[in-house]
Amino acid sequence: MYGIEYTTILIFLISIILLNYILKSVTRIMDYIIYRFLLITVALFALTRAQNYGLNLPITGSMDAVYTNSTQEEVFLTSTLCLYYPTEASTQINDGDWKDSLSQMFLTKGWPTGSVYFKEYSNIVDFSVDPQLYCDYNLVLMKYDQSLELDMSELADLILNEWLCNPMDVTLYYYQQSGESNKWISMGSSCTVKVCPLNTQTLGIGCQTTNVDSFEMIAENEKLAIVDVVDGINHKINLTTTTCTIRNCKKLGPRENVAVIQVGGSNVLDITADPTTNPQTERMMRVNWKKWWQVFYTIVDYINQIVQVMSKRSRSLNSAAFYYRV
């Protein structure tokens, strides 16, 4: 009987010792895991605070440290700046070294050599089909032309705002717009858009669904058209699909790393009257000079004031990003 009791006590003591050993081992392992996790967290925090190498790494543009914008005449580290200008500008200047000269002038305003990019486009209409705004800050120079005033306004609305867009299959489906921020945006070499509003029985309102000629034309031979129809009503859409695409888009808000500078014209284009523009601020400015050298000199002089009303953003804009931005 005593042998059985001694055996039971011995087994109990061994179990306690074994359990104590297991608990100490688990504690050491947990301490190791926790300390490693804290070390990695501190290291990542230091890196992401030092430079923009973290999870929000920009798709394009520089990875320079972000500095507060300043209007003071002191040199500070900046990010990339893209300057978009029409072919007319380089033709009038007619100087093979004009970009290098301007780069040196930007350097005096705090923009290091190599941080300013000059991008030429042929005309407003062609530029609107495939805008490529890749820099941290983007300035688009638009020469005012009364005959292109509406095209300029639509382009400004496109590039000064962010849009979430999805493709539309107008051959199979009817579409309706859900609110003021919902627009259809068509792009291509030649876009002619016609619509036929439908009642609840899918019969045409003032048009015949089987007769395209009876549809209402809302865009003709355009390269960019932002289409707005009556909300909450289905529409049958006819489109020149061989030369144009159309997307169902929702305006998300201002694209704050883009500004438009209008060259000439009696009045600056105003897109803030659009109820979907919120907040009611615009990054559009006007300079009145006949010579392009004078235009560029003015931009260099006021570049830091211009950038101050902008905000560095990580999103880029090209035709693909515009159509499928997530």
UniProtKB/Swiss-Prot annotation:
Residues modified by glycosylation: 69, 238
Cited InterPro entries: VP7 (IPR001963), VP7_1 (IPR042207), VP7_2 (IPR042210)
Main localization (coarse): virion
GO molecular function, one term: metal ion binding
Region (GPR motif): 253-255
Keyword Signal: yes
Domain of life: Viruses
Secretion signal, residue range per the UniProt entry: 1-50
GO terms under cellular component: host cell endoplasmic reticulum lumen; T=13 icosahedral viral capsid; viral outer capsid
Pfam families reported for this sequence: VP7
Residues binding Ca(2+) 1, per UniProt: 95, 206, 214, 216
Disulfide bonds: 82-135, 165-249, 191-244, 196-207
Region span, CNP motif: 165-167
Post-translational modification remark: Intramolecular disulfide bonds.
Localization in the cell: Virion; Host endoplasmic reticulum lumen
Keywords linked to the UniProt accession: Calcium, Capsid protein, Disulfide bond, Glycoprotein, Host endoplasmic reticulum, Host-virus interaction, Metal-binding, Outer capsid protein, Signal, T=13 icosahedral capsid protein, Virion
Binding site residues for Ca(2+) 2: 177, 228-229, 231, 301
Additional free-text comment from the UniProt record: Some rotavirus strains are neuraminidase-sensitive and require sialic acid to attach to the cell surface. Some rotavirus strains are integrin-dependent. Some rotavirus strains depend on ganglioside for their entry into the host cell. Hsp70 also seems to be involved in the entry of some strains.
Subunit architecture: Homotrimer; disulfide-linked. 2 Ca(2+) ions bound at each subunit interface in the trimer hold the trimer together. Interacts with the intermediate capsid protein VP6. Interacts with the outer capsid protein VP5*.
Family: Belongs to the rotavirus VP7 family.
Reported function: Calcium-binding protein that interacts with rotavirus cell receptors once the initial attachment by VP4 has been achieved. Rotavirus attachment and entry into the host cell probably involves multiple sequential contacts between the outer capsid proteins VP4 and VP7, and the cell receptors. Following entry into the host cell, low intracellular or intravesicular Ca(2+) concentration probably causes the calcium-stabilized VP7 trimers to dissociate from the virion. This step is probably necessary for the membrane-disrupting entry step and the release of VP4, which is locked onto the virion by VP7.
Protein name per the record: Outer capsid glycoprotein VP7
Organism: Rotavirus A (strain RVA/Human/United States/Wa/1974/G1P1A[8])
Lineage: Viruses, Riboviria, Orthornavirae, Duplornaviricota, Resentoviricetes
